[in-house]
Amino acid sequence: MSRLRKALTTAVLTALLVGSTAGWASESGESALNGPLPGTAAWLADDSLDKELPDPTTATPSEVAVFFADLTDTQQQRLVEDHPTVVGNLDGVPVNLRYEANAPAGDQVLAYDPRGRGLIARVAGDLEKAAHVSVIVPGSDIDISTFDRTARWAADLRAEADLRAEADLQEEAGDGTAVIAWAGYTTPSGIGLDLATGRLAEAGAERLTRFTDGLDAVGLPAPSLFCHSYGSVVCGLAAPEVDASDIVVMGSPGMRADDVTALDTDARIWAAKSPDDWIDRVPNVEVLGLGHGADPTSPDFGATVLPADDVPAHDKYFTPGTSTLTAFAAIACGDL
């Protein structure tokens, strides 16, 4: 890329992402949530079971799963009652115990961390019986206060998948596909440089990888990831390590990869972009750390492009009745 083009591209990105009249970035940007979960110190000090509890900051999901499998029902219940925050957010803990620990936050809540803007994951469908699992990874401005939209997308995808399964007589309704709305990372907030860099996406990719490792540790099938907008940056960075059968991106500013080969994954890559999506006006470049690179719907990228002509806007890819949601459901059910 010529020096002039680099300068012009940087100027365009700065104008789009910092100087927009829609808002201004905060001076410091968002801080990715890190550090031990609340209650970790009490958890590690608990010797009531006469055995060492797994360290939430260092134990792998597989190690956590093995630990809980060796406990009696009474011992498991004691940990849920005494340490709900740790049990409810520890990847590798059985699904039913996480639900119980997170019950004050709602039904079928798989993770709930109220620190900062808050992180949450909620399940639509019967996760413990599901033959297929999907995870929706949202983009910017999603946290506990704005989570309802992502939860609605999960419910709509699950409903479409159930309709498809019923029509194909593949599985009983409700058992075939479960969809997890995963707001499990700190997303960019407002208009600003966080949208143009991979800083928050890198932290999100680590969290997503651990989350999917946790699903695998409790015996669930490898999920299909549905990654919206900035969430597709998260999925792109997670691709080499994440346990997924499919990665589906929509309204994507780029995945920080030149093509599917650069993603270094065995997962199938799908992409959708509506002609009415404003993301099409964002330059698909990466210069000096700004921008997220190639358009996943471009022919050179190599993803399988899904229909999206009837999607009316950037945040409408899961709208019932659209060809895009129909295609998403086929992927979620394992039909494509």
Predicted feature residues:
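Flexible, membrane-associating and regulatory peripheral segments of lipid-active enzymes
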Residues: M1-R149, A165-E171, G334
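Hydrophobic alpha-helical membrane segments, chiefly transmembrane helices and signal peptide h-regions
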Residues: A7-A25, A205, G236, A272, ...
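Generic recognition of flexible, low-complexity loop/linker segments
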Residues: V109, L119-A124, D213, C235-L237, ...
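Lipolytic serine-hydrolase domain surface
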Residues: L127, G139-D143, D148-A155, E160-R164, ...
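Structural motif
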Residues: H132-S134, A222-S224, D246
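Soluble periplasmic/extracytoplasmic beta-strand elements of cell-envelope proteins
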Residues: S134-I136, A181, F226
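Gly/Ala-rich beta-loop-alpha elbow adjacent to hydrolase catalytic centers
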Residues: F226-C235
